[in-house]
Regions:
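Hydrophobic/aromatic interaction determinants used to assemble and anchor large protein complexes
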Residues: 1-289
Length: 289
């Protein structure tokens, strides 16, 4: 399963590299090195993947213990993460760069995909999406044939909480970028001035991260109807870890702000712009958490 997963990623990104090279807008004739590298990844990866994947499928079809093995569940859900996360990241890059160009900022100001093109992102989304669809359909078929679902349920639970944390991080970081923007002294224009890419990057993160987080959170909550989910130690551990992380960051942020205020009250001379710069990061982090 480990070799199958690695070879799958090798083939997938080899295809993405090949297609990006073929459809590159700024390259009329791709170099031989670029094409050779992409083709080598594909030609080496395909037979290795097929040998190990078909081997694993035959073993699962003939052995019920193999079919319900934890390592098989880990393969499926890890492979889904390795294909779906790039889909989300490339979609985020598309939105971020589109917003940046709309307000006439340099595309390099985009937090994600500043050096990429829309073709690069669409190719990555398409190829990873096709691979994820195949894996998802195969996983659904496996679920129908499971005689013991406990191992798969445990790994699926962990998979859901990885997405939950991933979406939450995008939301928090996006809100932090937007709030930090509010501390900047407005210049001649609201959007397009120095540092204003923060709010654009933050909005892009919120637009992508919020649906991911809300959907995953609803899925986790709906799963509580199952007795094993409601009593899961993993669920309690994730909730406590998120709560503790939020408390630690809020307390640390409050400490930084109090330090700045105490130094100001004790006579330190700080201009308004300098003061806002010092408190912008801790406050913008503390409020979302």
């Amino acid at each position: 399963y480990a070799v199958a997963l690695i070879s799958l990623e090798v083939v997938l990104w080899g295809l993405i590299s090949l297609l990006r090279t073929m459809f590159a807008q700024d390259v009329l004739f791709p170099t031989a090195d670029t094409l050779a590298q992409a083709l080598a990844l594909i030609l080496v990866g395909v037979p290795i993947f097929l040998v190990h994947w078909l081997w694993a499928q035959r073993a699962a079809a003939s052995d019920s213990e193999e079919q319900t093995a934890t390592v098989r569940a880990v393969f499926f859900y890890l492979a889904l993460l390795f294909t779906l996360v790039p889909v989300v990241q490339n979609f985020l890059a598309l939105i971020d760069r589109a917003f940046i160009e709309t307000v006439r900022l340099d595309r390099s100001s985009a937090l994600f995909g500043g050096s990429q093109t829309w073709i690069d992102n669409l190719i990555a989304i398409l190829m990873n999406g096709v691979a994820a669809a195949y894996l998802w359909n195969t996983l659904r078929a496996s679920w129908l044939n499971l005689t013991d679902r406990e191992n798969f349920a445990d790994v699926r639970r962990l998979y859901r909480y990885v997405w939950l944390v991933y979406g939450l991080l995008m939301v928090v970081f996006g809100a932090q970028q937007v709030l930090r923007f509010l501390f900047f002294i407005p210049e001649a224009t609201i959007l397009g001035a120095s540092g204003r890419e923060m709010v654009i990057n933050g909005i892009a993160l919120l637009l992508v991260g919020a649906p991911v987080w809300l959907y995953t959170w609803k899925t986790c909550q709906d799963a509580l109807a199952e007795p094993l989910e409601a009593a899961s130690n993993l669920r309690l551990g994730v909730l406590y870890l998120l709560s503790l992380s939020g408390v630690v960051v809020v307390l640390a942020s409050a400490g930084v702000v109090l330090d700045v205020l105490f130094r100001l009250f004790l006579g330190e001379t700080v201009g308004l712009e300098r003061f806002l710069q010092q408190v912008s990061t801790p406050i913008s982090l503390g409020i979302p958490l």
